[in-house]
Amino acid sequence: MKIDSIIVAGYFVIVFIAGYFVSRHYKKASAGDFITGGRDRTWYQVAFALFAMAADPAIISLCGLGFLWGFYIIQWNSVHMWFTAWFAAMFIVPIYWRSRIVTTPEYLEKRFSLPCRSLFSLLLMAALIITLSGAVYLGALLLENFLGWPLWSSMILISAIIGFYVILGGMKTVLTMDFYQGIFVIVTLVIVIVAVVNKVGGFAVLANSSIISKAGVSIHTIVPPSDWSLTTTKFFPTQAILAWAPITGLAWLSCNFSMAQRLLAAKSEQDAQKGLLAVAILAVFYPLASFVVGCLMRIKMPDILPDEAFIKAILVMVPVGLRGILIAGLMAALLSTVDGMLTASSALFTEDFYSRIIRKDATPTELKKVVRIAEILTILLTLALIPIIRKADSVMVFIQDFYAYVFGVTIAIYLIGMFTKKVAPRSGFIAMITSVALTIALDVFSDVNFAYIGVFSFIVTIVMFFSLSVFEKQPATAVDLENLTVHTLSDAKGPWVGLKAWPGLWKWALALAASWVVFSFCWEAFMRSLANS
């Protein structure tokens, strides 16, 4: 345990020193570069930064899902990323890139109205800060469980390290740090899966298991169960995966500013597109490791709690020393997620509220100062919310419900704005508010599965928008929609606008879809061959 503590402490020291030198290098960056990252990242830098942001400590929660529901849950992640990344690269990235937005809510103002922008930005900031508090708490809990470090001291340490290099160097520093930490996270996951699989006796143990998951299917199958009931308690049956995963995946990549901020930092539109497709593959890798470990722990330790599966795997199956490296890898995932949320929430406040509403004539120097103050206040608010989060039954359930409430509504508005020329700003705002309210009511007063609630919010928003827009008077003067829809891009028109910057995009999109099918068949064949040997 002492050796592990030394390794993790050494990792924190390295991050602190690296953060200091990288921050010093970017300390004099302009206000725009401080917020956006300078728009100079190559596609692989974008991909690793996106991956580091996505691969947070929820790895532990995913392991628990694999323990309880089985390996088929990976289909959610596959559809969630592989079938939406190409869509976002083809249609959404060209619009974001040409419209030169700084935050994702800014698109809603350019396309619809300022109230739409302000509402979504406010909701997104709230979600980011709550998720940030949960991530810091979870990271400190890991250090307490694995190494015996004091909980509050660990939370303050994590916040201080991240706050130091984020506040000093801004988004450019975050992108540089996340690139290397993303690589470290991948190495960590490889070590975890190799160590656990070898310890339990190989994949044959999983293939020969007769354990039935809570979903009623074999724990090792990749085929999801079928359930047509809207009130099903199963976690992502086939119908829910096909209906909700593409919607929430597209929203997560396109509307969620903490992810889109990294796309907007690419040095070209093509780099953003390539980075998006690359992370679609990488982002399925960490659930693969988590679910395999969860399933194997169900076989070896069936009596433990699902959320203990990952922790027990490291404590029992990984030797001292190597355990410290793995914990450091988990901390890398944590830091990359937390620094991304910190920069995103402060940028949202600065761009969507301070410079747009509070002080429109703010100078670049003033904006840079405001960003730093917002980051300090966000860290303090994050720590202040942790006692409340500790009392909550499940922070992750709350966040999951929030995304069902908001992301289905928001991506519907975005898609309407991008694929139609209809100008109806009031209809957009009313549809957003009403749909969110109806979605919350449906969740509170019914037993409908949260995935179907998200689909409901998506459909209701579209129907309500077009119904209301019939009665909305069109503006007397023509509205400039240049670079705001797929029909009005300045240099690319037609259904496949993404091919303008990257003509080979369609080939890689097909390859990505084919990879999903091949992976599914190969996994099932692999399990059956081991079971029959």
Protein language model regions, located:
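Membrane-embedded helix-loop-helix hairpins and adjacent transmembrane boundary segments
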Residues: 1-533
